[in-house]
Amino acid sequence: MKKFVAIAGNIGVGKSTLVKMLCDQMGWDPFYEPVTENPYLADFYQNMSAWAFHSQVFFLAHRLRSHFGLAQNPNSVIQDRSVYEDAEIFANNLYQQGNIQDRDYKTYRELYETAVQFLPPPDLVIYLRASVPTLLNRINSRGRDYERKIAPEYLKNLNDLYESWIENFTLCPVLAVPADDLDYVAHSGHLRLIVKKVDDKLTGKEEVVFEPEEMARAAED
């Protein structure tokens, strides 16, 4: 039976890497964040408060279209970043920073919440949870120049929004992965453990956690 899984998490946590590795293991199709030419982006960086709303609506429209297409795809797919994160994390963060006005944010939320009602949810959201030091370490390791200026405070704000969102998310099951403790690139055992937990959630097991003892054993593989 076809499955639709989305991987969520902060900048630098390792979403794209896990998408590829899980798809290689499970024989599923990966779907990465599309490189989309946002016509508002240059204006946004010049004047965030004037163009944040327009930019976020553009991104939301593309993310909604991608989500709907993946839900209709006959093959099992794993998505790099969900539609929910656009609204619940990034647009919310811009609003909290004062870059989206109250009435614009209310309109954005109404648009998002109405659209989401008509979207079939994923079968599972995998949430990669990591501390700011882990995020910074991974960001530095991958060496993208445009990410080197990301402040720890910005990552912390996003982490706080992620935790609030995932705690209240009820549209589909969630598997929280302790990314501080699991290095699925360095340890094949960690990857196999994640695959097992994903299978557990997709087959209906409700309480799926990563026990310290099994993570330690998996690191030895």
Language-model features, listed with the residues they occupy:
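Pre-Walker A (Motif I) flank of P-loop NTPase domains
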Residues: 1-4, 74
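Hydrophobic anchor at the beta1->P-loop junction of P-loop NTPases
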Residues: 7
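P-loop (Walker A) phosphate-binding loop of NTP-binding proteins
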Residues: 10
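Conserved lysine of the Walker
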Residues: 15
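Conserved substrate/cofactor phosphate-moiety recognition/catalytic segment
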Residues: 24-62
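A glycine- and Lys/Arg-enriched "phosphate-lid" helix/loop adjacent to the NTP-binding pocket
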Residues: 89-163
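NTP-dependent small-molecule kinase module
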Residues: 137-149, 153-221
